[in-house]
Regions:
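Conserved mixed alpha/beta core segments that line enzyme active sites in large multi-domain catalysts
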Residues: 143-183, 232-466
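Negatively charged, flexible loop motifs adjacent to catalytic sites
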Residues: 7-13
Length: 466
């Protein structure tokens, strides 16, 4: 327990020194300032300052949990040992109400372990575990100095997340509440890294650039898109985007999330645009592509098909607002193209149950490559999660050969977006399954038809039909 000794007698400073207590001179004109500094320094408030125990000089300073995580392996051993013996780390965490980590580290005594490298690892892993736990299921405000690979979901702005954004936040929260999702070996159940530009950013963009008059007019889609592309996004977003690029280091999907989207009785799937951009080392080129994609999603609210759908569903177009989801694209790079081994679309209601299936059990449509193939109505593998061994397409040889997927979508990593257009798939490649076989992407997801034995075998085999 840190001590503070207050006295009007200067001679008592020696007693304070022997007790390793802070001394406050009551006769000092700045007594209140000295007291505040002593409390901040000894009770864990303020920055955590690592000191050299021999010289008492500062060797490192951290402002928050992320910075402590970053420096824990570089702090000199004698300094870290000095603070561990005195429980300074746990005290600092207590003062910030980070109780789980503080309680855990307080129990790890130097006398019991006496291994500085082990202490470093324990502190680091405790912080990482806590930050992962806190970040899941929470829509935190995006802070560029704190967003890192342990962050999952954040928002920029104070408006609505939109329908799709709310759905993703709900799923993230559900994953956090069900630890059984972490029980699968070599499988991590998480949503991709996500940042949502809330609807107030959309409002600011529309108002600042005076776009409403054109957007609500009868102008054609291309005219609306070109006007939106010429408009400017708020300058303050630039540094946030750069911070997001530094963490994700992967292609990014720019997805619509309007107020009305994903409502239960009025699905908006395929109405608004979704763009993808490749990851580039040149941040400014990525910024240009990302800005164009965000503006393209905003513009899609006012395309003719969108207005017609709004009218058909008895909604008012000038009341619609758009949030935008920036999301890491999960997949693997194969040369100049990028795609996942499997994409899926899950439906909570099975409208056409077969045999033992029930409507409440839902269905999943699975396909090779990007999910656009599924949304566009391509041939997919339909599976009921409750009956994974009973798949209609594999029940008979003729059906399996007739209804198997033959093409798929991949992101063209060479396309830098200079041909940006109304078609949100302008930089996607439509490839054959043979291309995926050459990439080695089918090894664990495909079966092969053997025409000699008239059977389907798991895996890929030469001189056969996949």
């Amino acid at each position: 327990m840190p001590l503070i000794l207050q006295s009007a007698e200067e001679s008592n400073r020696a007693y304070a020194s022997r007790l390793e207590a802070s001394f406050i001179d009551k006769n000092s004109k700045k007594m209140n300032i000295d007291l505040r500094d002593a409390v901040s320094r000894n009770f864990g408030f303020g920055d955590f300052i690592f000191i050299n125990p021999r010289t008492m000089e500062e060797v490192a300073r951290v402002h928050n949990l992320k910075e402590l995580q970053n420096v824990i392996f570089s702090v000199p051993a004698e300094s870290l040992q000095y603070h561990i013996i005195r429980n300074h780390v746990s005290r600092w965490l207590y003062s910030r109400a980070i109780f789980p980590v503080a309680e855990f580290l307080k129990q790890i005594r130097w006398e019991g372990l006496q291994d500085i490298d082990a202490h470093r690892k324990i502190i680091f892993e405790a912080i990482v575990k806590y930050r992962k736990m806190k970040n899941q299921g929470v829509v935190a405000v995006f802070q560029r100095d704190r967003f890192d690979r342990y962050s999952h979901f954040a928002r920029i702005g104070d408006g609505s997340l939109g329908g799709k954004g709310r759905g993703l936040a709900f799923i993230d929260n559900m994953v956090k509440r069900h630890p059984e999702f972490s029980e699968f070996e070599n499988a991590s159940v998480v949503i991709p890294k996500t940042v949502v530009l809330c609807t107030d950013i959309f409002d600011e963009f529309m108002d600042t650039n005076l776009l409403y008059q054109l957007a609500l007019s009868d102008a054609d889609d291309d005219t609306i898109l070109r006007a939106f592309l010429k408009a400017k996004l708020p300058d303050r977003l630039v540094e946030d985007f750069f911070a997001f690029f530094d963490v994700v280091k992967a292609p990014i999907a720019i997805r619509s999330s309007s107020l009305l989207e994903d409502s239960h009785y009025q699905p908006f799937a395929g109405i608004y645009s979704t763009y993808m951009i490749p990851y580039l080392e040149d941040k400014y080129e990525m910024l240009r592509m990302l800005s164009d994609a965000i503006k393209g999603v905003y513009a899609s609210v006012y395309y003719r098909d969108s207005k017609a759908y709004m009218q058909a569903t008895s909604n008012v177009i000038d009341q619609e607002k758009m949030a935008v989801i920036l999301q890491e694209v999960v997949g693997t790079q194969y040369g100049d193209r990028y795609y996942p081994a499997i994409s899926g679309v899950a439906r909570s209601i099975n409208y056409y149950p077969i045999n033992d299936e029930t409507a409440e059990e839902g269905t999943v449509s699975l396909a090779l490559g990007l999910g656009k193939y599924i949304v566009d109505g391509g041939l997919t593998l339909r599976v009921c999660p409750y009956h994974p061994d009973k798949v209609l397409q594999t029940s008979e040889m003729e059906i399996a050969l007739r209804e198997t997927q033959t093409r798929f979508y991949a992101l063209d990593l060479k396309n830098n977006g200079h041909n940006f257009s109304l078609d949100d798939g302008f930089n996607l490649l439509k490839l054959t399954v043979k291309d995926a076989e050459n990439d080695g992407a089918l090894d664990y997801i495909a079966s092969t038809y053997d025409p000699y034995d008239m059977v389907i075998r798991d895996g890929i085999y030469p001189a056969a039909v996949s």
